[in-house]
């Protein structure tokens, strides 16, 4: 099962990914949390570019796609194949939103990611940019060049407009506990279908 958590910076993706993983592991489900860009060579190169000189949007797309292909081949597909729950803190919709906000065609970006397995549930944590930026400052970080009100507004608009069948929008202006409860309920809906009668005990524990 593949769970992707998306949203603009400051939406609470990392917090939710950790909370969901803790809950799922607690009821005996093998769960892996990963992120994009990854800590692999391509993801590392992308982060280094912020210091050594930014890539162009087209170059960033190339590096992101290389990073994602490796991620899919080395972790996502193998772990799903063994029956694990894979939780991703950002996935291909982030590239579509952020590079789309930089002016690249959204349809072309989606097509370039056709190789990436589609999530069973895509949790879009929706917050206004002003709240996302406030949270970034509150956690002691300094917003990067992507993290401006104007740019995050464009990204948010693209996230909300994306037509992906598994997308579920969660109001992430609420507190972390409320967001977690909403997300867990959506994940349980998918697990109920996936596990069937055999998963009754697991679902009962998750609901407890």
From Swiss-Prot:
Biological process GO terms, please? dTDP biosynthetic process; dTTP biosynthetic process; dUDP biosynthetic process
Q: What is its EC number?
A: 2.7.4.9
Residues recorded as binding ATP, renumbered to this chain, are: 7-14
Q: Which GO terms describe its molecular function?
A: ATP binding; dTMP kinase activity
Q: Which GO terms describe its cellular component?
A: cytosol
Q: Which InterPro entries match?
A: P-loop_NTPase, Thymidylate_kin-like_dom, Thymidylate_kinase
Tell me the CDD domains matching this sequence: TMPK (cd01672)
Query: What catalytic activity is recorded?
Result: dTMP + ATP = dTDP + ADP
Record key words, sorted: ATP-binding, Kinase, Nucleotide biosynthesis, Nucleotide-binding, Transferase
Instruction: Give a Pfam family name.
Output: Thymidylate_kin
The source's domain of life comes to Bacteria
Q: Which NCBIfam families match?
A: DTMP_kinase (TIGR00041)
Q: What does this protein do?
A: Phosphorylation of dTMP to form dTDP in both de novo and salvage pathways of dTTP synthesis.
User: What family is reported?
Assistant: Belongs to the thymidylate kinase family.
Stated name of the protein? Thymidylate kinase
Species source reads Xylella fastidiosa (strain Temecula1 / ATCC 700964)
Recite the lineage of the species.
Bacteria, Pseudomonadati, Pseudomonadota, Gammaproteobacteria, Lysobacterales
């Amino acid at each position: 099962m593949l769970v992707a958590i998306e949203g603009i910076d400051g939406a609470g993706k990392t917090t939710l990914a950790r909370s969901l993983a803790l809950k799922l592991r607690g009821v005996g489900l093998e769960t892996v949390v990963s992120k994009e860009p990854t800590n692999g060579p391509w993801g590392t190169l992308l982060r280094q570019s912020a210091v050594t000189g930014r890539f162009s949007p087209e170059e960033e797309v190339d590096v992101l796609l290389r990073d994602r292909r490796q991620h899919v081949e080395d972790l996502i597909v193998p772990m799903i194949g063994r029956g694990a729950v894979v939780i991703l803190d950002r996935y291909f919709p982030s590239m579509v939103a952020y590079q789309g906000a930089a002016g690249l065609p959204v349809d072309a970006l989606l097509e370039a990611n056709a190789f990436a397995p589609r999530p069973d549930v895509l949790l879009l944590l929706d917050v206004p940019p002003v709240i996302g930026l406030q949270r970034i400052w509150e956690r002691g970080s300094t917003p990067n060049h992507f993290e401006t009100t104007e740019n995050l507004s464009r990204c948010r608009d693209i996230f909300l407009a994306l037509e992906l069948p598994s997308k579920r929008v969660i109001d992430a202006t609420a507190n972390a506990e409320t967001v977690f409860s909403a997300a867990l309920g959506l994940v349980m809906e998918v697990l109920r279908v996936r596990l069937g009668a055999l998963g009754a005990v697991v679902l009962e524990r998750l609901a407890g």
